[in-house]
Curated annotation (Swiss-Prot):
Pfam families, per the entry: Prefoldin_2
Function comment: Molecular chaperone capable of stabilizing a range of proteins. Seems to fulfill an ATP-independent, HSP70-like function in archaeal de novo protein folding.
Oligomer status and interactors: Heterohexamer of two alpha and four beta subunits.
Species assigned in the record: Methanothermobacter thermautotrophicus (strain ATCC 29096 / DSM 1053 / JCM 10044 / NBRC 100330 / Delta H)
Keyword Cytoplasm on entry: yes
InterPro entries: PFD_beta-like, PfdB, Prefoldin
SUPFAM superfamilies referenced in this protein's UniProt entry, alphabetically: Prefoldin
Gene3D superfamilies assigned to the protein according to its UniProt record, in alphabetical order: 1.10.287.370
Record's GO cellular component terms: cytoplasm; prefoldin complex
Name by which UniProt lists this protein: Prefoldin subunit beta
Lineage: Archaea, Methanobacteriati, Methanobacteriota, Methanomada group, Methanobacteria
NCBIfam families: gimC_beta
Gene: pfdB
Major location category of this protein: cytoplasm
Keyword annotations: Chaperone, Cytoplasm
One annotated GO molecular function: unfolded protein binding
Length: 121
């Protein structure tokens, strides 16, 4: 049985939104990993003596910097990453809600067309 044009269109939109949700999930994982790395770096810095020589990576080189300067820089980076994480989470919630709504709409459209969704028709 051929799917009605409107159902085909809704399914295509649903698949696009699924891809978007997957991309958002990858972004979220990346940001979470960066947050963890930054937190670990801050923990290590907090254990170092105040006059310890510390270095930061800049491309392929290491540059010696003051501990407090690097700590401040990493704190700012952490705050930025945490804001980004919250933004991504809100985006993810919106997309997941939209996916659920679309799934219901597609199922109703298929029932209206005499197709039993999920039964392999």
């Amino acid at each position: 049985m051929e799917l009605p044009q409107n159902v085909q269109h809704q399914l295509a939109q649903f698949q696009q939104l699924q891809q978007q949700a997957q991309a958002i999930s990858v972004q979220k994982q990346t940001v979470e990993m960066q947050i963890n790395e930054t937190q670990k770096a801050l923990e290590e810095l907090s254990r170092a003596a105040d006059d310890a020589e510390v270095y930061k990576s800049s491309g392929n080189i290491l540059i010696r910097v003051a501990k407090d300067e690097l700590t401040e820089e990493l704190q700012e980076k952490l705050e930025t990453l945490q804001l980004r994480e919250k933004t991504i989470e809100r985006q993810e919630e919106r997309v997941m809600k939209k996916l659920q709504e679309m799934q219901v709409n597609i199922q109703e459209a298929m029932k209206g067309a005499g197709i039993n969704p999920g039964m392999g028709n």
